[in-house]
């Protein structure tokens, strides 16, 4: 009737320490899981699949710096990529989801003094859509949580970034 639903636990997944975020790729039957201080993991998403995962990429303390927080998927030019927030250095990385899991992009959301908008920092979560949101966001948007709002000096907020700005920075596929 649309008012009631039930769920049944079909399996449990585990990583060595604290899981922080996850995103599912329905097209490829894969679940990506961020382990806060350590790595991004890849698991088969089917209910009867194994419960062991594979490390996609480890936090290296240089580009990907703990805490590993939000995860989202980007599908572009026939490629599926995972976007991750690297809280320890206030940045974002995009990795190919196919081995050898190459880092494709590393970027920051920086201050725009002309518009009075500060950059993002201490991101705990993010998400994106690749559907058009109208003028300025025709290819979608990335939304990131900003833990320290500096312009003006107030509580945390969200930053909305046109996805086409990020897609333009990605290396072209061959």
What is the predicted function of each stretch?
Residues 1-174:
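Sequence/structural signature of beta-propeller domains
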């Amino acid at each position: 009737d649309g008012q009631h639903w039930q769920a049944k636990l079909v399996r449990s997944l585990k990583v060595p320490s604290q899981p922080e975020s996850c995103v599912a790729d329905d097209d490829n039957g894969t679940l990506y899981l961020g382990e806060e201080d350590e790595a991004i993991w890849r698991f088969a998403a089917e209910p009867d699949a194994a419960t062991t995962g594979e490390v996609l990429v480890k936090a290296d303390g240089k580009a990907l710096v703990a805490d590993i927080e939000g995860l989202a998927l980007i599908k572009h030019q026939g490629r599926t990529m995972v976007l991750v927030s690297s809280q320890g250095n206030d940045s974002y990385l995009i990795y190919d989801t196919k081995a050898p899991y190459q880092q494709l992009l590393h970027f920051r959301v920086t201050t725009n003094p002309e518009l009075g908008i500060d950059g993002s920092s201490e991101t705990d979560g993010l998400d994106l859509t690749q559907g058009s949101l109208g003028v300025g966001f025709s290819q979608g948007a990335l939304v990131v949580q900003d833990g320290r709002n500096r312009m003006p000096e107030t509580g945390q907020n969200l930053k909305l970034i046109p996805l086409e700005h990020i897609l333009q920075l990605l290396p072209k596929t061959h």
